[in-house]
Amino acid sequence: MALLQIAEPGLSPQPHQRRLAVGIDLGTTNSLVAAVRSGLSEPLADAEGQVILPSAVRYHADRVEVGQSAKIAASQDPFNTVLSVKRLMGRGLTDVKQLGEQLPYRFVGGESHMPFIDTVQGPKSPVEVSADILKVLRQRAEASLGGELVGAVITVPAYFDDAQRQATKDAARLAGLNVLRLLNEPTAAAVAYGLDQKAEGVVAIYDLGGGTFDISILRLTGGVFEVLATGGDTALGGDDFDHAIASWIVTDAGLSADIDPSAQRSLLQAACSAKEALTDAESVEVVYGEWRGTLTREALNALIEPMVARSLKACRRAVRDTGIELEEVEAVVMVGGSTRVPRVREAVAELFGRQPLTEIDPDQVVAIGAAIQADTLAGNKRDGGELLLLDVIPLSLGLETMGGLMEKVIPRNTTIPVARGQEFTTYKDGQTAMKIHVLQGERELISDCRSLARFELRGIPPMVAGAAKIRVTFQVDADGLLSVSAREMGSGIESSIQVKPSYGLTDDEVTRMLKDSFEYAGDDKVARVLREHQVDAERLLEAVQGALDADGERLLDEEERLVINLQMDELRELMQGTDGYAIEQQTKRLSQVTDAFAARRLDSTVKAALAGRNLNEIEE
């Protein structure tokens, strides 16, 4: 609930009377904090006048060093200096070991638990490292604004899953920050440009940072920012450009690819410096140790072209998700320091057929937008009216159904916050419990989706199969965090779970889930139809077998039992194969040959129920 602001008649509250809230861009390479002052959103500088804080943390035995000095010391003290910690947020040790070549740290911890980086100050989790960055930003903001913060809006990549978002909130709390909201980075950029340009129409947000790439397609109408679709690649960014240049240096200099962490840091610093110099120059001299070489912009373009092409492919996919054409995109906003690379801007302009917008510093635009939203959430009235943000979930959410199928409850690109419910039922007679398996992904089979959580609903009243009604409700809050509940409608029993996975998706998994959903759409549909026919067949076989065991000897002669058993054997054999149509047809044949048996059972049941009762009793 926003506090009511009171001022003398005819006077507006002064800036220091506003509730102090900030927007924070917690980036892979750099981080920033911004705030609204005198009606304008602007980044806040440190005592030296620097706005950008490198996301680097160096641990000493008795103190913590954050920022530029830590970044510079990384090559001399690689084991105690953590860079790009954002890549580790919400992930397990097994996942981060896959990035071992790029992360020169000593990890400790169980294989399925949060990774800890072994430092001279002891083990440090990614949450703790991020918290140390956030503490510096909080202290900077409070010093600049002259008071204690009521909260912060912190931005995250659109592709961050539940575990990564929760880890970000945990880091903020550890840093002494009240999280007003987590905001997708592309949406924050849209807020910044929407405020300055009052634009309406369809806009693309191309966000290429140090470690992640996000593309979002938004519709801006009358102050409402609606995210139509999102996409991207969590394993693509300026860091990857640096690694490509570093590989070129190693090859051109004839060096061994097996180098120690300290040398690797120096190599990457040389690569990054060359990349930045080529933003304005056509060629640059690269110096690494005793080796000197020349890298041209043309050569750089060739090195990074595969990565640029990957980003454009994600752009096309996101536009296709919206159902619009590329020509309908009226503006393209560039976000992230890596969009300064000339080839990136050229490629984006070629794809969308228009020059991208770069009026706001691409390193600052996300923090500026987050600050605008933080100011609004803190209860400070904005000139020009209110602002409504409609984020979306990046991947579909659903449940496992019989046959190992994924039943989507909330499709991807659904606006959040959202709550959706769907009714399910029991599979077997007398079933008193149901296992709820929550999944995330775009494929039809659960083996191709990501498992988020499992829980059970117990105490379901015994009924015949299909009679119970269990309503499962998915709720995603404004931060993208998911809770799931299941309720048996007759008895009212309920069970629920808040989905907090111990670690998040790997980079490869995030990319694969969307890519494969398109690439294997046809195969998935065939596989789903096959499994549905197999489930129907299995259900019928169980029902027929149960009927035979109960009444077969009494109601069928030997020849009738033989015919039914032959049809059942035929169906069981077909179920081992992959011909869904054949299974469907044989299921129908078995159903037909058992129709007479079912009718006799019904007749027998009715007669048994009426035995010994007269007409008057029946009518009553």
Curated annotation (Swiss-Prot):
Record lineage: Bacteria, Pseudomonadati, Pseudomonadota, Gammaproteobacteria, Pseudomonadales
PROSITE patterns hit by this protein: HSP70_1, HSP70_2, HSP70_3
GO biological process: iron-sulfur cluster assembly
Keywords per UniProt: ATP-binding, Chaperone, Nucleotide-binding
Keyword Transferase tagged: no
Protein known as: Chaperone protein HscA homolog
Recorded name of the encoding gene: hscA
Organism listed in the record: Pseudomonas syringae pv. syringae (strain B728a)
Protein's UniProt keywords contain Protein biosynthesis: no
Record function comment: Chaperone involved in the maturation of iron-sulfur cluster-containing proteins. Has a low intrinsic ATPase activity which is markedly stimulated by HscB.
Stated family: Belongs to the heat shock protein 70 family.
Gene3D superfamilies named in the record: 1.20.1270.10, 3.30.420.40, Actin, Chain A, domain 4, Substrate Binding Domain Of DNAk, Chain A, domain 1
UniProt cross-references to HAMAP family, sorted A to Z: HscA
Signal peptide: none
InterPro entries (alphabetical): ATPase_NBD, Heat_shock_70_CS, HscA_NBD, HSP70_C_sf, HSP70_peptide-bd_sf, Hsp_70_fam, ISC_FeS_clus_asmbl_HscA
NCBIfam families: HscA, PRK05183.1
UniProt GO MF annotations: ATP binding; ATP hydrolysis activity; ATP-dependent protein folding chaperone; unfolded protein binding
